[in-house]
Each structure stands twice: as structure tokens, then as C-alpha cells.
């Protein structure tokens, strides 16, 4: 019997990332775990619908035995079974992030006995989670370089706080892993601004695009009007295509916050990314830790190692026989496997 791994959910940033990473790694390695103080660092600690959906999805995909899988629970015991490929559908029942549920179960399906399709309904444009377009346009091309083949499709938008969106991913088992090297992003090739609107006046998008264009030379400026019943909602994105990587940054509009202020938040984030030579932004760095660890080698550079990133690395090192190295030089941190 494999040893039980004990995790403290209050570790590091004290959010849901510890639980999501632990579920992924437990399914992959077969190691059971217990976690206490789940989301202790959040205003509403314990399992919310999004986290409970991730637990139930993991349980179904590998036939796990679970204790503590209920709303508000701050303790969970998870004993994984065998990961099975197949066609899965999960509903969050709120505007909780579809992509974070997918992030939990897809790594296990890289090791399944056949191809899979996972469909999740809930929130797609959530201020605290990467949107589907980020997964599709930024993360998945990098996963393909590592040898991981999955394809995400946004079937319907669901803005926070209403939800109602649907995201699906098709994934194949990994034949072999390759090493990812992302030391520098290289010169910028082009930048693209995009605004999504649902049940929001078009002039909001025009003002947001104008704010972006006032700070950056945009190769493309796109405004997409979605059906009113998918809103109300508004998301502003800016994609930075460089020689070695494409990064994408986003901000979700809020009620009683002007279009100019919303877009200015995005401008600030992109300028911070461009101020260094680092290849990877803060959100993407979080996503690369697990696939890189599974490959057993690789590196990337990031300007600002987040608490999320450090917490994720700590959890990965509990389950896998790898050690990460973080070396800071001239404001850029090189993250690699020793």
C-alpha cells in the first residue's frame, strides 16, 4: 500500500491550487492524500462548488474513495483508483471556473488507457481563473511541444457571477514527454487586442480598445458581440506574440467600473510583463510546473514568482521525485528542474 501524503491547505497562498494539484498528482501517481485547512487563506474557507466539482470529477475518472467531499468541508481524504479514459460531463452549478476543473483532471487523463473528452459547465470568464482562450491559444501549444496533445473548445460563454458557460477538452494519452525550454521570449512579433461583450453597450468595448491602443501598437483590434443571454459580461484581452512564445493577458469588466479603468488594469499587467525579458507571465508559470515535472526536465523564466507558483512547486515535490531550482538574476527568475 502506498504511503499517505498529508497536506496543509493553509500552506503558501492558502487557496484551492493545493487541492487541485494534489488531486492531479494523486491520480497520476496512485498515492493517497489527506488535506486539512482547505482554502484557509480565503474569505470563505472550505470547498466551494467549483472545488467540490473538481473532487467529484477526479473521483469519477479514477474510481477513488473519498471522505469529506461536501460543501464547506475543510478536510478531505482521497484514495485514487485506476484512471479511465472516456466521455465525461460535469456541472459546477455556479459561475465557478470551468478551466480550473479541467486543470485538475486533464493531467491524469494524459496517462489514461485511451482518449477522453471532458465537458464542464459553469463560469468561463472569471476574474480569478484563466479563460478558455488562454488555455487554447497559450497553454496548449506549449503542451504540444512537451508531447501532450489536448484541444479545448469554448462552446458557450458564462460570465461571472451568472455562469452558464460550457467548455470541452479532447485529450489523448501521452506517448512520451519532451523537454520544454523557455529561457527568453525573443522580440515581439505583434500584439492583438480583443474585447468580448454580452448584454453590454458596444461603446464600452470601443473605449476599452482605445485605451489599449493608447499604450500599445496593436496589429489587430477585435470586438466580439455575444448573444445577450450569455451575459451580462465583458472581458478585455491582449495577446503578445513573441518569437518564442505567445502570452495572453485578460481582465474581466465589473459593474460600476469604467471601461477606461478596466482596460488600464490590463495595460498595467502587460507593461509589467514587457518590462523584463522573462518568457512567461504569472498565470502561465503556474500551469507549466506540473507538465514540466512529469517530463522530468525543462526550464522557463518568469519576472515575478507568485505565491501560487511556489505553493504549486511545493505540492509537486511532495508527490514526484523532482526538485525545482529558482535562480533570480537581474529581475528575472529562472525556474528549472535540478
From Swiss-Prot:
Keywords, alphabetical: ATP-binding, Cytoplasm, Ligase, Nucleotide-binding
Catalytic activity: a 3'-end 3'-phospho-ribonucleotide-RNA + ATP = a 3'-end 2',3'-cyclophospho-ribonucleotide-RNA + AMP + diphosphate
Keyword S-adenosyl-L-methionine: no
Keyword NAD: no
Effect on the protein upon substituting residue 128 to A: No effect on RNA cyclase activity and RtcA adenylation
Localization, UniProt: Cytoplasm
pH effects: Optimum pH is 8.0-8.5.
Effect of residue 103 to A: No effect on RNA cyclase activity and RtcA adenylation
Gene Ontology cellular-component terms listed: cytoplasm
GO MF annotation terms: ATP binding; RNA-3'-phosphate cyclase activity
Main location: cytoplasm
Active site residues of this protein: 308 (tele-amp-histidine intermediate)
Record note on what altering residue 250 to A does: 28% of wild-type RNA cyclase activity and 38% of wild-type RtcA adenylation
Function recorded in the entry: Catalyzes the conversion of 3'-phosphate to a 2',3'-cyclic phosphodiester at the end of RNA. The mechanism of action of the enzyme occurs in 3 steps: (A) adenylation of the enzyme by ATP; (B) transfer of adenylate to an RNA-N3'P to produce RNA-N3'PP5'A; (C) and attack of the adjacent 2'-hydroxyl on the 3'-phosphorus in the diester linkage to produce the cyclic end product. Likely functions in some aspects of cellular RNA processing.
Name of the featured protein: RNA 3'-terminal phosphate cyclase
Originating gene: rtcA
